[in-house]
Amino acid sequence: MKTLLLTLVVVTIVCLDLGYTLKCNKLVPLFYKTCPAGKNLCYKMFMVATPKVPVKRGCIDVCPKNSALVKYVCCNTDRCN
């Protein structure tokens, strides 16, 4: 009985994420990265002239301001970028 209980505890720890970690897409959305502590936003950067083609994606702590040439879209759920 103790072995079964210990096994269930180990499986629970392995299956559950003990601390919430955000996952953000890399430039190619098939791949993603787990964000380090403090980086709690995903972002997508693209040129204003070509809004359908992202230039960069990843994790960030604060969403940058848009400029005349570059636009940022930020979000805070897994793989939302």
From Swiss-Prot:
GO cellular component term of the entry, any: other organism cell membrane
One example GO MF annotation: toxin activity
Signal peptide: 1-21
Gene3D superfamilies: CD59
Entry keyword Cell cycle: no
Function: Shows cytolytic activity on many different cells by forming pore in lipid membranes. In vivo, increases heart rate or kills the animal by cardiac arrest. In addition, it binds to heparin with high affinity, interacts with Kv channel-interacting protein 1 (KCNIP1) in a calcium-independent manner, and binds to integrin alpha-V/beta-3 (ITGAV/ITGB3) with moderate affinity.
Protein name as it appears in the record: Cytotoxin 3b
Organism of this sequence: Naja atra (Chinese cobra)
